[in-house]
């Protein structure tokens, strides 16, 4: 499934919890479309995020992001039971994703 990164916030380890990550390359990641499969999200292990395209539509098919270890995650389904939103908390960040149409 494809998801858009809608926000990246501090988890509280290196910034005030819940505030937007504006350090380093974090702002550039907002709006990027990624491929995520919740079956591959494991608590205690880093998450590998496969970028599909940048926010302007430029292909990023061969780019990856390795996060710090996942602490927890939650999903929100739509009425048909399809995952619409995913929030993944890692040791350093809280990523929020929204489902987008597959290519």
Q: Model-flagged regions — what are they?
A:
Residues 72-103:
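Short, compact, well-ordered microdomains
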Residues 1-81:
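N-terminal non-globular leader segments, chiefly Sec-dependent signal peptides
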């Amino acid at each position: 499934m494809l998801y858009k990164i809608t926000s990246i916030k501090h988890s509280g380890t290196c910034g005030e919890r819940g505030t937007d990550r504006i350090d380093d390359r974090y702002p550039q990641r907002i709006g990027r479309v990624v491929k995520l499969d919740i079956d591959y999200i494991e608590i205690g292990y880093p998450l590998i995020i496969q970028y599909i395209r940048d926010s302007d539509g430029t292909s990023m098919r061969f780019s990856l992001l390795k996060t710090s270890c996942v602490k927890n995650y939650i999903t929100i389904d739509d009425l048909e039971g399809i995952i619409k939103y995913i929030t993944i908390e890692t040791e350093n960040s809280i990523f929020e994703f929204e489902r987008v149409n597959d290519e």
